[in-house]
Regions:
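A short acidic, often aromatic-flanked loop/helix-cap motif at beta-alpha or helix-coil junctions
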Residues: 60-66, 85-87, 136
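Glycine- and other small-residue-rich loops at beta-strand/loop junctions that grip anionic moieties
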Residues: 54-58, 110, 134, 138
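Short, glycine/charged-enriched secondary-structure capping and boundary segments
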Residues: 28-30, 92-95, 119-121, 144
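Structured adenosyl-cofactor binding patch, chiefly the S-adenosyl-L-methionine
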Residues: 115-157
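Active-site/ligand-binding-proximal alpha/beta "capping" segment
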Residues: 72-73, 77-112, 117-118, 127-129
């Protein structure tokens, strides 16, 4: 996931612990994982000829991640959600994007976001979007939405 995110233009990756995440990391294991993920990000940046090496942040809770994007004044935050219907939401989001904007994308865990996490996202102003009729795996959803963002922000449409 880290490798593909970096290759597709992500400026950074913050691992988020959610209720349905299959892997639960204690603090010591999380630090080791983040170091490994950072090495993957560096390798992917080099391979894809990026001039900037995206940083992998420390693992945080979903609530902490929502607070972080609020504090950092992201221009837009969205959450692909399998119960969101139709493609109008993602079309509207893509239509409003402009180069240079800070965009946060929350990709769900293997078990998906639970209802309370989605309610929290809505309260925090995170826009739920559909990625189509199919339910995508975590490792597919991230690259799918990043490819759409890259195409839009790099002027392909």
């Amino acid at each position: 996931i880290i490798q593909k995110a970096v290759e597709l233009g992500a400026a950074g990756v913050i691992p988020v612990a959610t209720r349905n995440a299959v892997v639960k990391l204690d603090e010591k294991k999380a630090e080791a994982k983040v170091r490994r993920w950072q090495a993957i990000a560096e390798s992917a940046a080099k391979q894809s000829k990026r001039s900037y090496i995206p940083q992998v942040g420390m693992v945080m809770s979903l609530k902490e991640a929502f607070s972080y994007i609020e504090e950092q004044k992201f221009d837009l935050s969205m959450i692909p959600y399998e119960l969101e219907k139709g493609m109008d939401g993602i079309k509207q989001v893509l239509g409003r994007l402009a180069p240079g904007q800070q965009i946060a994308v929350f990709i769900g865990p293997e078990g998906g976001f639970d209802e309370e996490e989605i309610k929290l996202a809505l309260r925090m102003g995170v826009k739920p979007v559909s990625l189509g009729k199919r339910i995508l795996r975590t490792e597919t959803a991230g690259p799918a939405i990043l490819a759409l963002l890259m195409m839009k922000l790099e002027g392909a449409f």
